[in-house]
Amino acid sequence: MPTITLPDGSQRSFDHPVSVAEVAASIGAGLAKATVAGKVNGKLVDACDIIDSDATLQIITPKDEEGLEIIRHSCAHLVGHAVKQLYPTAKMVIGPVIDEGFYYDIAFERPFTPDDMAAIEQRMHQLIDTEYDVIKKVTPRAEVIEVFKARGEDYKLRLVEDMPNEQAMGLYYHEEYVDMCRGPHVPNTRFLKSFKLTKLSGAYWRGDAKNEQLQRVYGTAWADKKQLAAYIQRIEEAEKRDHRKIGKRLGLFHTQEEAPGMVFWHPNGWTLYQVLEQYMRKVQRDNGYLEIKTPQVVDRSLWEKSGHWANYADNMFTTESESRDYAIKPMNCPCHVQVFNQGLKSYRELPMRLAEFGACHRNEPSGALHGIMRVRAFTQDDAHIFCTEEQMQAESAAFIKLTMDVYRDFGFTDVEMKLSTRPEKRVGSDELWDRAEAALAAALDSAGLPYDLQPGEGAFYGPKIEFSLKDCLGRVWQCGTLQLDFNLPVRLGAEYVSEDNSRKHPVMLHRAILGSFERFVGILIEHYEGAFPAWLAPTQAVIMNITDKQADFVVQVEKTLNESGFRAKSDLRNEKIGFKIREHTLLKVPYLLVIGDKEVEMQTVAVRTREGADLGSMPVAQFAEFLAQAVSRRGRPDSE
């Protein structure tokens, strides 16, 4: 009979097989009521699952991350229950957990409307209020097929076909509604009270635009009402910061249907984009990178050699000319190897750091496109470092330091790092992987940076480090990457002459700091809500006159500031000064300079900030010095 070992090391013995729920009840009524599921010998199981031999057990409650994920998964099933009651002809497809929520894909004869979503949410609350038990039944495959045939659930039958080796499957019954899942799920709907449906969208069966279109219902769920309210507040704040709305309001960019996933940059937005590019160009030049430019359209033969044609063709835009097939490059790496291959290199020339602001195109599904955050045409701050195995650690350490410095300049100090190690299927010897993983780990350790280990999550051709920024709302954006590659230099014949005069393949480090410029601009817009630090602001100062008498001095100040390397504009419109100040404050211009008769007489400017602070009057040269200091701080706090 089982002896159960709990996380604190205490043990409980039973004279009969017991469920997770029964063990929880033996500990206390409060824990029994809070039990969502269990973790038996490290494996998540339902609260009703039986333990019949000695085991370790962790009781999972809504306070645990796994408990929250189970609540979200069960909410997806609850969507199915409500939809089938309201729209009996709907066919249920899949309902997975996603970051901070869940969705359910549904086949229905018409698109769902916001009114439908409200009705589904209301019915879900009604079902939750009955506090019914969710019943799990492990069911033989043949019976599962009969269950879904009887209900006309064609997509569920297709999913069963996808699992030919599964002879028994978990069916979860929400009263008359049944769904198929590996689980676990909550034992009762009382755990699901803190949820909200958030949006509707279209989707495709299996994510393929050639397949039938489905309706996708998104939602979020939390452990309690307080967490849900905090999330809703965060979402409302995020909507206020939506880069698409701010981009339009500030005249930064737009997108349109005739060029899906492509950006029309307006003067203000293009100015911001160029500031990023010029900054990164200087940073990379100062750190030993050589800037190059490679073709946009490349013959399919190179993509076949690199492996992209076989593995990435669906995401590539292709064309044909004079009986030859070409692809618009989705990435820069194969072209950078071609530059390295021009002339045999010596070990003395390594490391060689080749950088490109590489314009790439990827055929992303139209449903996945989102403003400038997810596009089809984008530019990367892409670079590839060709080095020896012995140089891997030093190059990695230098890149990590550079990356963290860049992020600080943009105002991001909370950076998460993940080290992904060897997957089961991989190229290269275990000894090479040992050295590569050790090099990346040592580089992170030498920088004194904490990181999460992701075993088995590396690419087949090498381990990698991912850098993710946390913005002012706590959202995490994966931007930077350092990817070691043992494969591509071999495939594309990259070699150097080593110290012993033999030829060797270099290790290739794929690296990016910002990632996509377009996406990074979107992140900056939302992080700063359009109120960029002075160094990034498209217009750093606007000079305004009170009456026509000051116009000449306004123009003179504008010329002085622009000749000093700043981005200044004048506003000579025949409008009240209060109107001008309000307008440029809404346009998020950092500094507003007002010139009246007194300022003309004293040859000064009255300086206000967009936040409303009055900095007083000062000579133009003094303001230029003040602005230069603000620009030099970049996005770092004043104390740095």
Swiss-Prot record:
Binds 1 zinc ion per subunit. Its main location: cytoplasm. Pfam families: HGTP_anticodon (PF03129), TGS (PF02824), tRNA-synt_2b (PF00587), tRNA_SAD (PF07973). InterPro entries: aa-tRNA-synt_IIb, aa-tRNA-synth_II, aa-tRNA-synth_II/BPL/LPL, Anticodon-bd, Anticodon-bd_dom_sf, Beta-grasp_dom_sf, TGS, TGS-like. One of its GO terms (biological process) is threonyl-tRNA aminoacylation. It catalyses: tRNA(Thr) + L-threonine + ATP = L-threonyl-tRNA(Thr) + AMP + diphosphate + H(+). Its cofactor is Zn(2+). Zn(2+) binds at residues 333, 384, 510. It comes from the Bacteria. GO terms for molecular function: ATP binding; metal ion binding; threonine-tRNA ligase activity; tRNA binding. Its EC number is 6.1.1.3. Residues 1-61 form the TGS domain. It is found in: Cytoplasm. GO terms for cellular component: cytosol. Coiled coil: none annotated. Keywords: Aminoacyl-tRNA synthetase, ATP-binding, Cytoplasm, Ligase, Metal-binding, Nucleotide-binding, Protein biosynthesis, RNA-binding, tRNA-binding, Zinc. It is an enzyme of class 6 (ligase). Residues 242-533 are annotated as: Catalytic. Catalyzes the attachment of threonine to tRNA(Thr) in a two-step reaction: L-threonine is first activated by ATP to form Thr-AMP and then transferred to the acceptor end of tRNA(Thr). Also edits incorrectly charged L-seryl-tRNA(Thr). Belongs to the class-II aminoacyl-tRNA synthetase family. Homodimer. This is Threonine--tRNA ligase. It comes from Pseudomonas fluorescens (strain Pf0-1). The lineage of its organism: Bacteria, Pseudomonadati, Pseudomonadota, Gammaproteobacteria, Pseudomonadales. The gene is thrS.
